[in-house]
Amino acid sequence: MQKIIEINGSNLTIEDVVAVARYGAKVKLDEKQKDKILESRKYVEEALSNKMPIYGINTGFGKFENVPISEEELELLQKNLIYSDACGVGEAFDTEIVRAMMILRANAISKGFSGVMIETVECLLNMLNAGVHPIVRSKGSVGSSGDLCPLAHMVLPMIGEGEAEYKGEILSGKEAMKKAGVSTITLKAKEGLALINGTQAMMGNAVLAVYDAEKLLKQADIVASLSIDALGGIIDAFDERIHLIRPHKGQIYSAENLRKLLKGSKRTTRQGEKRMQDAYSLRCTPQVHGASRLAFDYVKQTVETEINSVTDNPLIFPGENGACISGGNFHGQPIAIAMDTLGILMSEIANISERRIEKLVNPALSHGLPAFLVKNGGINDGFMIPQYVAAALVSENKVLAHPASVDSIPTSANQEDHVSMGTIGARKARTIVDHAQHVVSIELLCAAQAADFWDSKNLGVGTKEAYRTLREKVDFMENDVIFYPLMDKSFEIIKSAILLANVEKIIGLLK
């Protein structure tokens, strides 16, 4: 029986979000949160009855903050906010991103500081459970005040507007909700603002990118070890003593992984046996992979914190000394910097992987392997062009790794005079992770092919399992074949993290 993810604004994890977004896990609201949601809603209604002026509830938005809104127009104000802000451009986000946005926004407003109705939280959860996925255009957010534009597209079907995907068909929002049996809602005072003034579009991208990146970091060690094994690499460079006197945690862990993976190899060598030192792409694998791991720890911690944060404005603090306070929790800068960091650290994983690919295919560098890892070179091109593909991907990553978070263009007539560009950063980071997965999967193909030119039986205990995992899907390439299906199969092994799962079954958990 599939686990049901219960949301309460405090305990949602990266794995929970992925379970809902990618694998369709069901969701429900923690019953204990209902009183907190009701309490914050009660504060809003009492403030309105007392004619208290509150930003975005009975005033305009942004530069219109000082324009009062009459009681009769409060619901119209919220509807107009969604209408006007739903102006995104570009391709629609993938369904898994939209689902991540939905669960993350529901989680944030369920915490009890947003002043929404319980029915509003449950509408998002019911849509997730029924498979109603708003069509959310991917471009148009500057990352402060939150992700207004994409989240407005997310809200449209909730009020019977916009478009949504349901059972593979693009329908009007109203029709999708009706077919799925999910009731639409009427936005009450503050609710439109509470739904769109948050960081959940950048976070939808961020959570999935972080999840995939974490799997890739360990698999990069696995694939690198197979390349090192196939090339007869010098294992002295991974000696524990070297890494303990430069005690960066990521470097120590990566070196430990390599030793564990290469244990029992009859292909690896010792310094001085055949050569004194290996090229940096082999010898410095722990230092490069380790630096990315260390930076990743910061990225993951930031994203984990944001998952259970309240990021709208103004915020309701109900109770005896209740207050509604305007602040800046919608500002995406924490995620913007983290996503730029993720893009950079993943670019480096791909960069060094591509250099190992070059070492495997280049006969001047491969210590006895045939040119481009193929018999009868000339009539066969072998693995020549996959290296081009890897080079193209790492080159594109270098452009994408330019930080978005250092840019800011003022908006709303300079009222919102510093913005994060965090959603741009998160979209870029997700693309870079995808590219890095492809590059590492190309290295896996090359390393396994290289191993077969010697004797795969001589591989280490971990590298042998990595080799076997690929060979279950992809055979040794005797002569040129249509290549992209092989690359697709190798990519799926990396994307699904089956490589990691299989290797860890044999040698135990990697660091």
Curated annotation (Swiss-Prot):
Keywords assigned: Cytoplasm, Histidine metabolism, Lyase
Pathway in which this enzyme or protein is active: Amino-acid degradation; L-histidine degradation into L-glutamate; N-formimidoyl-L-glutamate from L-histidine: step 1/3
Chief location: cytoplasm
Compartmental location: Cytoplasm
Molecular function terms, GO-annotated: histidine ammonia-lyase activity
Encoding gene, per UniProt annotation: hutH2
Claim: S-adenosyl-L-methionine is one of the keywords in the record: no
Reactions catalysed: L-histidine = trans-urocanate + NH4(+)
Source domain of life: Bacteria
Modification(s) after translation: Contains an active site 4-methylidene-imidazol-5-one (MIO), which is formed autocatalytically by cyclization and dehydration of residues Ser-Ser-Gly.
Primary enzyme class: lyase
Site of covalent link 5-imidazolinone (Ser-Gly): 144-146
Modified residues (2,3-didehydroalanine (Ser)): 145
One GO cellular component term noted in the UniProt record for this chain: cytoplasm
Protein name: Histidine ammonia-lyase 2
PANTHER family on file: HISTIDINE AMMONIA-LYASE
Gene3D superfamilies listed in its UniProt record: Fumarase/aspartase (Central domain), Fumarase/aspartase (N-terminal domain)
BP-aspect Gene Ontology terms: L-histidine catabolic process; L-histidine catabolic process to glutamate and formamide; L-histidine catabolic process to glutamate and formate
